[in-house]
Amino acid sequence: MKRFFVFLIATALISSTALAKPAQVSVTRTTGGNAVEFPNKHIPSGYGVNKLIPLNKELQTRHDIKSADRTHKMLERNSSALTGLLINKGRIVFEGYKEPARSTSKMHSMSMSKSLTALVIGNLYCDGKVNSLDDKAIEYAHWLDPNTYGDTSIRNLLMMASGMKKQGEYGQPIRKAYERLRNQKIAVPWVLSNNQNHSRTHKQGTNHLYNSGDTLALSQVTRAFGGLVKNFNYFIWSKIGPEHEGSWMVDKRGHAISFAGFNATLRDWGRLGMYTIDMAKGRGGSCMQKYVQDMLSELIRNERRPGEAGRAFSAYGYQTWIMDNGNAWWVGYGGQRVGINVELEKVMVVHSYIENYMTEVYDIFNYFADQD
C-alpha cells in the first residue's frame, strides 16, 4: 500500500511538471517566417498619420529611464525574449531586439490577433454596418450552424461567452485547427460547421470559455462587408501610418485566420496599441470610445479553470484579457503580449518564443504604468 501511495505521488508530480511546461513556438516563424512560409494577404504601409515619436532621450522622464532599464535587463536576462517596446503618450521610451528579430521582422501575433478582430467588429458596428452587438451571428453569416455559433450573439462571441465546448488544445475549436488552417488543409467555415459536432456546455453569456471558434465566428460576420482583412486595412491599418507591410495568414479559401494570424513589425504593433488608446479616449468618435472602453473593461469573470488560458487575468473584455489593476492585455501563445493602460496612455509590446518570463513582463508594465 505504501509503495502504491508513493507511486501516486510521483505520478502526480510528473503530471504537474508536464502541465507546467511553458508554451513554446518556432523562433523562425515568430520572427517573420509565418508571413512568408504560408499563404498571407499582405496590406501596404505608408498610409494614415504616423503618431509614433522615435526615441529621444532628452524627452525622457526619470520614470521612463527606470522603466527602460528594467525592460533592457529583462531582454538580456531571458534567452527566449525577442523584442521589447515601451511607449509613453506616443513617445518610444525603449525599443530592443534580440537575434533573429530585427526592426523589419514581421513578428507573429498568435492569439493577439483576436483583439484586432474585436477592433474590426467595433468599427463595423460604429459605421452602421452591424446593427446591434446583440444580433445573432447568423444574421450576417447565414452559413453558420443555426444551433451553435450562428445562434450566438456578436456580443457573447466578443466576450468568449458562446458557451461552446472547445475540442482542441489551447482553446482551439477542433483538434489542430491552427495548424490545419495554416497548412491549407481546411477552411474556416468547415471548422465551424455542424460536421464537427459542436455543442454548448453553458448557456451563452453566462460563462467565459476560452474558445477560438468564437473569434472565427466573428471573422465570418465581417464577410458580409468584404472580410476581415479588407476591413482591418480600411478602418485601422491605413489610419496608423505603418512603416512596413502587414500580413494576415489565410486558409485555403482565403479566409483570415482571425484567432492567430497577423504579422507586423514591433513598432507597428506599438502603433496598433496607440490606435486602441486613441479610440478609448474618444479620438475616433463617441461610439468607438464606448465600444473600446468596454473592450478593455472587466465584462465577464475569468473562471481560471485548471489548464485553461489566461490564469494571470481576473476578467475578460472583448477578445482582450483584463488584470485586477485594470491594465488590458492582448495575449499570444508562446509569449506574445501587448499591454495597454488607457489612463496614462502607455503601451508595452513583447515577443518571445518561450512563455517563461511573463510575470516579469507584467511587473515591468505595472511599474511603467503606475505613474506619469
Feature locations, PLM:
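Structured C-terminal helix/loop/strand segments within mature extracytoplasmic catalytic/sensor domains
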Residues: 20-27, 327-372
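Active-site SXXK
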Residues: 90, 108-132, 157, 218-222, ...
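Active-site helix/loop module of the DD-peptidase/beta-lactamase fold
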Residues: 108, 127-165, 224-260, 264
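Active-site-proximal alpha-helical segments within enzyme catalytic domains
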Residues: 214-223, 260-282, 336-352
